[in-house]
Structures are given as structure tokens and as C-alpha cells.
Amino acid sequence: VMSEERYLTFALGKGRLAKKTLELFEQIGITCDEMKDKDTRKLIFVNEEYKLRFFLAKGPDVPTYVEYGAADIGVVGKDTILEENRNVYEVLDLGFGKCRMCVCGPASAGELLKHHERIRVASKYPNIAREYFYNKKHQTVDIIKLNGSVELGPLVELSDVIVDIVETGSTLKENGLEVLEEVCPLSARMIVNPVSMQMEADRIRKLVGAIREQLKIQP
């Protein structure tokens, strides 16, 4: 019967998330040694025993692969899920990659957030920023999309504040910025294609259950 099964395909966000996810899979008995080969040119990796396929993708693309069913399951940061806003089910908080999405700026900008002034907000996450200011705070803002070094925004007076991921806050401190408001907590999540969720309900439920148990026993 095993050979009749189709492969369950996973899209993993490249980098630390993928590494952590694969470690987690190993703990529940799912190995994929090919993926550990640093020199490999392969794009898709297979575990024949459990009929699983894995591929690595850029974080922001993971929800796209999952929405279109090119991957049944994805592992990606909550920031990406919120920003990309794809039609996927979020089934599990994996608990690693913990950080926060925050509004940051110089201390003086705190006042601008209180009085609903029209301010400029720089962010790699324009959708998250828009959702937060327009729908949660009901504050009209101009959102400026940047692709990196967002901390520069307030320093060169491109923006009053930024919306960005904060882990330790040391980069902010070095640049005379601070967390002014917290938008939401973030961590790695497992997402599933809605059709796969129905068609492969048992396999996916078993997998999610096994991972959930494993996460419970971790320190």
C-alpha cells in the first residue's frame, strides 16, 4: 500500500528555519541526509520511507507554493504569513525563531504615535504596517517600502518611524532608536494547503501530532 501514496511535499524557508525544522523532523524519526550535504546542487530532496519531498525556498515564496498546492506543507515565519496574506491554514506554532514585530523610532517619535498625526513609516513589511496603523490604530500614515537596513529610515529622515522585526534590540540601541509599540509576536509556523488539509487529513494530522508531542518535551 505504501507505494500507492503520493508524496507529501514540504516547502521550507531557507536558512535558520530550515535547519531547525530538519532537526525537529529528525527527532520524530524523519531524516533527509541529502539535505545536509553542503555541496549538493539538488533542489528537491526525497525521503522514500515516508514518501516525503522537501525543497528550500525564499521565505516570502513559501506561502505562495503552499497556496497553489505546489507544496502541501510549508514552514515559515509568522511575519511572512502576515505580509504575504495567502490562502493557507496555519496549523502549528513551532516556537523557534521567536521575535517581535514592532514600531521603532527615536524616543521623540513616541509623541507622534499618540496624536494620530500623519507620519511616514518605513518597512520591509508594508502590508503589516498598513494593517496595524490603519485597522488597529486608525492612524493615517504614509508607508514607504524598503528592502533592508530599515533602521536608516529615521536616521536620514526618510521616515518618522519604522515597522520591523526586533530580536534583541541591540541594532536599534546602537542607532539611537527604541521600540515604541509592539505590533505582534512572531515565530516559525507550519502552514498547510487547504485542499491537502482535506485530501491528506490523516497523514497531516499524524505529522502535526508527532511534532506537537516532540515540542512539548523540549526544554
Q: What does each model-identified segment do?
A:
Residues 2-219:
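Domain-level signature for soluble enzymes in the chorismate/prephenate branch of the shikimate pathway
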